[in-house]
C-alpha cells in the first residue's frame, strides 16, 4: 500500500520574507491522516488556519498567496513544491508572519528541513488525483494544460528576449519516474531582473530579495558570483514553481502538466478548471500490494 506521509518530528527554521523583508519564524509539525497541508498564522490571536487549497489562492503577483477571512499567507510555492516532491500529505506549517521565508530562493532548504525532521508513513492510503482527459487554459499567449499520463511529468517552456537567455536552455521536461526531484529540481532558485527591482520595491515587493536568495540578471549577464546551479536553472525553477502550485489540488498528481510561459496565476486557473470538471479526474489509491503504482517515493530515511 502507498501510505500517506507526515513528519516524524517537529522542526523549526528562521528566514526573511522575500517581499516583506521581515524576519519569519517557521515551524513544521506532524499532522494526522487526511489533514492535508495547513498553514497556521501563530502571530494572530486567535490563530488562523488556512488549508493549502487552490480555492484559497487569491493573489498571484510574483508569488502564490493564500487567504481566508482577510488573513493572508504569501510565497507558499517553494515549500509546497518540497512537500509535493517528497510526498508529504499532512503537515501543519506555523508562521510568525504573513509570508513563508524565502531561504535561498529554491526548495532545497525546505527539502533539507523535511528530511532532517524525518518522514513517517501513516496508517491510511495516499490519495492521488488521476487526470482522465486533457484540460487547457490560455491567456495572452501563455498556456497551461493537464494531460493523462501514467506517472507524473512536468514540461515547461519559457521565452525571454534577453542576452542571458540566448545561451540558456528555455525548455525542460521532467519525468519523475526516472528523475529525482531532490537532485534535479529542488535546488533551482527564483530569478529576477535588476531593472525590475526598483519598480518592485516602490510597490513594497522584493524588499527581502538579494543575491543570497535569487539569481539576479542585469542587462547583459548573471550578477551572482557563483553562476548557476543547473545549466537550465531558470526553466527548472519554473518547473519547481508549477509543482508547488499544482499541489494546491490537495493530492499528488498522476498525469502530465505542460506550461508555456505560464505563471502562478495561470497555474491556479488550470487547477480551478480541473476541479470544476469532475469527469476530467478521479481520486485513486493503491491499497493492494499487487497493484503496480505509477508513482513511487523514496523510503522514509531515519531521522
Curated annotation (Swiss-Prot):
Record PANTHER family: UDP-3-O-ACYL-N-ACETYLGLUCOSAMINE DEACETYLASE 1, MITOCHONDRIAL-RELATED
Lineage: Bacteria, Pseudomonadati, Pseudomonadota, Gammaproteobacteria, Oceanospirillales
Stored SUPFAM superfamilies: Ribosomal protein S5 domain 2-like
Superkingdom in the source lineage: Bacteria
UniProt GO molecular function: metal ion binding; UDP-3-O-acyl-N-acetylglucosamine deacetylase activity
GO cellular component terms listed in the entry, alphabetical order: membrane
Catalytic activity, as annotated: a UDP-3-O-[(3R)-3-hydroxyacyl]-N-acetyl-alpha-D-glucosamine + H2O = a UDP-3-O-[(3R)-3-hydroxyacyl]-alpha-D-glucosamine + acetate
Sorted UniProt keywords: Hydrolase, Lipid A biosynthesis, Lipid biosynthesis, Lipid metabolism, Metal-binding, Zinc
Binding-site residues, Zn(2+): 78, 237, 241
Keyword Zinc: yes
Metal-binding in keyword set: yes
UniProt cofactor(s): Zn(2+)
Signal peptide region: none
EC numbers for this chain: 3.5.1.108
Protein name: UDP-3-O-acyl-N-acetylglucosamine deacetylase
Amino acid at each position: 500500500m502507498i501510505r500517506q506521509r507526515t513528519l516524524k518530528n517537529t522542526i523549526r527554521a528562521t528566514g526573511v520574507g522575500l517581499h516583506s523583508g521581515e524576519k519569519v519564524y517557521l515551524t513544521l509539525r506532524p499532522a494526522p491522516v487526511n489533514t492535508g497541508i495547513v498553514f497556521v498564522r501563530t502571530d494572530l490571536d486567535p490563530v488562523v488556519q488556512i488549508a493549502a487549497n487552490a480555492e484559497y489562492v487569491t493573489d498571484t503577483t510574483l508569488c502564490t498567496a493564500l487567504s481566508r477571512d482577510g488573513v493572508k499567507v504569501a510565497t507558499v510555492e517553494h515549500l509546497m513544491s518540497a512537500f509535493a516532491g517528497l510526498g508529504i500529505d499532512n503537515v501543519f506549517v506555523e508562521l510568525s508572519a504573513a509570508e513563508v521565508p524565502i531561504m535561498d530562493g529554491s526548495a532545497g532548504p525546505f527539502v533539507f528541513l523535511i528530511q532532517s525532521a524525518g518522514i513517517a508513513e501513516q496508517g491510511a492510503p495516499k490519495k492521488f488525483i488521476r487526470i482522465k482527459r486533457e484540460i487547457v487554459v490560455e491567456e495572452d499567449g501563455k498556456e497551461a494544460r493537464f494531460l493523462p499520463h501514467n506517472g507524473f511529468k512536468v514540461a515547461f517552456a519559457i521565452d525571454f528576449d534577453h542576452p542571458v537567455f540566448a545561451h540558456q536552455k528555455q525548455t525542460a521536461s521532467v519525468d519523475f519516474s526516472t528523475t529525482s526531484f531532490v537532485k534535479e529540481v529542488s535546488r533551482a532558485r527564483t530569478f529576477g531582473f535588476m531593472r525590475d527591482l526598483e519598480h518592485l520595491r516602490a510597490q513594497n515587493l522584493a524588499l527581502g530579495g538579494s543575491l543570497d536568495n535569487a539569481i539576479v540578471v542585469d542587462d547583459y549577464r548573471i550578477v551572482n558570483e557563483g553562476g548557476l546551479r543547473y545549466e537550465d536553472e531558470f526553466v527548472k525553477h519554473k518547473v519547481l514553481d508549477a509543482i508547488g502550485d499544482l499541489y494546491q489540488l490537495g493530492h499528488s498528481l498522476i498525469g502530465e502538466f505542460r506550461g508555456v510561459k505560464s505563471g502562478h496565476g495561470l497555474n491556479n486557473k488550470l487547477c480551478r478548471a480541473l476541479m470544476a470538471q469532475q469527469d476530467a479526474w478521479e481520486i485513486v489509491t493503491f491499497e493492494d500490494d499487487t497493484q503496480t503504482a505509477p508513482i513511487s517515493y523514496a523510503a522514509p530515511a531515519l531521522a
